[in-house]
């Protein structure tokens, strides 16, 4: 008895194009990536020239928000770097130049973490620093659940975590704040937070995500020292004074 052949193409249903929920603020595609890049670097008074001053403000649109497009190849790192260099050349003053240079440095961090993951793939499983692989974490599951759900009682932490779950995105400063809170206040293993971020981030990149978590935890390359703790109250007052 002969095995049945492959079905005809006409018999295969064409899947419907997925529709992103309105809460995800990143329309897909190369055209949208280029539109955002141009609006960030190309206007008469481009946002990138204020990047050094505005990038940590949670209440301003001071970042490029290009990370999902870099993550999925709608925009290449080379294209972003060329735009950053052009913005540096076009800077009318020292402050504007510093803004574009700061953005370029952030792009370099992204490439650096990719290199780290390539040469040291075990960072996805353990701390980069061998002497920090036996930390006695408390790993309270109830505290972790409250952190995931945005129910810690700290407004800036809770707002950031709810934004992540609802929209798939979180401001970089907020990522550092919530990561520090999880690791250094709740004493929960950074890998728990790393996995949760990868489950929800629309720009989730294994290299950048791991590098960011290990930096905050103090276990990675050129990481924040163990005694540097982001105070969520002070961070809120400084970077989101009106609670936007």
Predicted regions and their residues:
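C-terminal substrate/ligand-recognition segments
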Residues: 114, 119, 142-188
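C-terminal, helix-dominated tail/subdomain
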Residues: 132-138, 196-244
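Helix-loop-helix junctions that connect adjacent transmembrane helices in secondary transporters/permeases
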Residues: 122-151
């Amino acid at each position: 008895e002969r095995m049945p052949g492959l079905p005809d193409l006409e018999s295969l249903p064409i899947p419907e194009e997925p529709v992103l929920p309105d809460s995800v603020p990143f329309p897909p595609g190369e055209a949208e990536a280029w539109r955002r890049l141009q609006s960030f670097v190309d206007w008469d008074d481009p946002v990138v020239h204020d990047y050094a001053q505005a990038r940590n403000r949670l209440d301003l649109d001071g970042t490029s928000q290009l990370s999902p497009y870099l993550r999925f190849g709608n925009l290449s790192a080379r294209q972003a770097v060329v735009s950053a260099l052009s913005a540096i050349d076009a800077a009318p003053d020292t402050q504007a130049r510093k803004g574009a240079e700061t953005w370029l440095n952030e792009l370099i961090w992204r490439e650096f973490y990719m290199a780290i993951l390539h040469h040291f793939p075990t960072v996805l499983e353990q701390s980069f620093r061998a002497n920090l692989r036996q930390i006695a974490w408390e790993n309270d599951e109830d505290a972790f659940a409250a952190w995931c759900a945005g129910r810690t009682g700290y407004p800036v932490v809770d707002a950031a975590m709810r934004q992540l779950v609802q929209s798939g995105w979180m401001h970089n400063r907020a990522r550092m704040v919530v990561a520090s809170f999880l690791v250094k206040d709740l004493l929960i293993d950074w890998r728990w937070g790393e996995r949760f971020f990868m489950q929800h981030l629309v720009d989730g990149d294994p290299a950048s995500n791991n590098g960011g978590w290990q930096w905050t935890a103090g276990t990675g390359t050129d990481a924040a020292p163990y005694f540097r703790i982001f105070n969520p109250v002070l961070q809120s007052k400084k970077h989101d004074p009106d609670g936007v």
